[in-house]
């Protein structure tokens, strides 16, 4: 099964979770390892080495260089634009809803996630963004880049969950730097996992897919734990 490179695990799954860049990719790697059913996973990155290291079978290299985006969102955006046909092909397998998850602030997630969201929405897929905003100590430049990315993302999704890492840190006060990053990835995983499981675990909460569509369609921006207080 795992040797079947490039094939989604569940060929007929209508829900796809897409990790873009480092943070989003880590979140999707974690979810994949947890073995969530009825959902297919894809990791997208400009860094070919990071993709090779992912356990997820379906991987999409953005752009032709394979060297990462060096914290430059414009580079991430151009790489995604270069790979538009691949992005469309990845979404053309009967996907009806997707969760596009990314850490905002770096190059690939910030630049490429909004492009993938745009393609998804143009294809009529119910598109949900789940993104994190950096920690304050990561610096103003990164936070400004992240907020620009969130703004761009919000134009191309039906719903957007924004997870503020500083708020996260106040909740988990004993976190070291490394743990804080892991926890942010974990929160991305939990958010995507809980929404997808609400839809797919029949009998637990029998929420009809059309109900979800009605709730989320062009529902604007839903922000979890906002502000830099």
Q: What residue ranges belong to the model's regions?
A:
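Tubulin/FtsZ superfamily GTPase core signature
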Residues: 1-229
